[in-house]
């Protein structure tokens, strides 16, 4: 494998889907929030992305079979919105800047092909003392201010590293609208509590009230076993 490769499982029928990213990172906040959305919407995996930029290991499943690291794309429909949800095993090494740009471009091309023009990225924000605060950055000041009343605080004068920041920035250059939700975390272990706060803020912002009640002790940190 010398370049990113998409494996399409089926082609979902989606209309103007919202693209939601939640990958590994600080406290795995984004990943847990994304998997909460997958569970809440009963989303189905429809594509996988493999790339030579991912770390050099394989994941071993419960049945003893192995596979390389991957990203997975899930499709979901609710009465309010259609979604493409991205989550995955890992990210390219932080020092490999070219790999991050390349894979983020591939992801945005893929989402654009399916009709996406609005993106939500989710991740963690390092804080010495966490208070379940959720911060927002956006592609425009107007958009950021619009969602302050939905439970988020403005994130200013900082950086958003990895795919969570880069996807939003590159999407803006394509003319998309979008936001980033950041949950405060110490960065140690899986932060289920703040991930749940990010998920609830996302639902408030998108006005998509899901019936499912997710307790922070039950926030999914792994893919459903039937989809490994």
Predicted feature locations:
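Secondary-structure boundary elements
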Residues: 44, 106-119, 172-177, 204-210
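Non-transmembrane, aqueous-exposed alpha-helical and coiled segments at domain scale
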Residues: 80-81, 93, 142, 148
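Catalytic cores of processing enzymes, dominated by hydrolases/peptidases
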Residues: 127-205
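A conserved C-terminal secondary-structure "cap"
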Residues: 189-228
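Hydrophobic/aromatic beta-strand patches that form the interior of the parallel beta-sheet core
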Residues: 47, 84-86, 118-120, 177-182
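Internal, conserved structured core segments that host functional sites
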Residues: 94-142
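Short coil/turn connectors at secondary-structure junctions
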Residues: 14-17, 43, 80-82, 114-117, ...
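N-terminal short beta-loop-beta anion/metal-coordinating cradle
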Residues: 1-90
